[in-house]
Amino acid sequence: LRCKYCFTNSPKGDHVKEYLDIKAIKKLADEADELGYFEFDLQGGELLLQPKKLFEVLEAIRPERFYMYLTTNGYYLDKAMAKKLADYKVSRVSVSIDSMDEKIHDEIRGRKESWKRAVEALKHVQDAGMDPYLNITVGHYNANTEHFKQLLDYSKDKKYKTLLNVAVPSGMWQNAENIICNDNDR
């Protein structure tokens, strides 16, 4: 997708040229386990764009040691992928939805049908036995809108947990000070 606020798509996001190799990820997970960490969160960019790499990372982490969760836009999370994530002991999947209005969500995400796929992804997560979280970015642009209230109602109605992320001027929104919540956004 081409989400309007993604750090990865920003000019400053171009600096990431190297990634941790599998050996380094395994070492990091082993150290986290030894130190008593119990959660492992995978996010950033879109993990499901490279499913082979994602499952290599999960194998290196050995998720059975942790409460394992990941965040996705849901575009590539179909029923088979949800089952595979559950088989790999992923406990929770957060799917980002920006509005219950399909057109608004798709505009923010930069791709048609992204809303439909995100909604379906949450159902696939729930059906696979993982904890579905509706991931909502909250900013001045939506804090007091009916769209925001509809998202919260939808999450409650479907028995999803809700994860609220406060918008900050970063990534493609680096200079967008108007996105930050202010005193009127309560």
PLM segments and residue spans:
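Conserved alpha-helical substructure of the radical SAM core
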Residues: 1-92
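Radical SAM enzyme [4Fe-4S]-AdoMet core and its adjacent flexible, acidic
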Residues: 15, 96-98, 103-186
